[in-house]
């Protein structure tokens, strides 16, 4: 079954009604038919950027707890590739959450991502394949 990677941007927008992408994020979640996949790095980034509103953080945690997103583990053995990606895209610069998502795309053979981050137009999966971006 097809899965869609999801970055922190749409997750933040989903739980922050004042975010300019809020309506787009809500519409995407309502109409999306595919499982969403992310990493703990993106979850952490989302919670950090929602720190202005404890209720939004709690709602987000409940949403994740209910299984709205599938969390993929990044282990010690994966850090070699994360380092390579971070070095390759150091001029952007690539943050840890983004490197985890690019790595996950490689690991799970996925290329569709829900993001508002323009850097994903530059990142390549295994150095070649472009991401299909939703919500940019």
Positions of PLM-derived features:
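Low-complexity, intrinsically disordered Gly/Pro/Thr-rich segments
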Residues: 117-121
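Activation segment
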Residues: 14-15, 114, 124
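PIN-domain endoribonuclease scaffold, especially VapC-family toxins
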Residues: 2-4, 23-93, 103, 107-111, ...
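A secondary-structure boundary/capping signal
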Residues: 7-8, 39, 116
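Metal-dependent nucleic-acid phosphoesterase active-site entry motif
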Residues: 1-19
């Amino acid at each position: 079954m097809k899965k869609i990677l999801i970055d922190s941007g749409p997750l933040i927008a989903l739980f922050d009604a004042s975010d300019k992408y809020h309506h787009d994020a809500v519409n995407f979640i309502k109409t999306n038919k595919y499982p969403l996949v992310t990493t703990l790095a993106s979850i952490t980034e989302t919670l950090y950027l929602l720190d202005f509103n404890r209720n939004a953080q709690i709602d987000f945690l409940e949403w994740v707890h209910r299984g709205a997103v599938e969390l993929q583990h990044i282990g010690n053995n994966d850090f070699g590739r994360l380092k390579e990606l971070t070095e390759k895209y150091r001029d952007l610069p690539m943050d840890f959450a983004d490197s985890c998502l690019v790595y996950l795309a490689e690991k799970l053979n996925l290329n569709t991502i829900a993001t508002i981050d323009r850097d994903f137009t530059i990142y390549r999966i295994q150095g070649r394949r472009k991401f299909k971006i939703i919500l940019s």
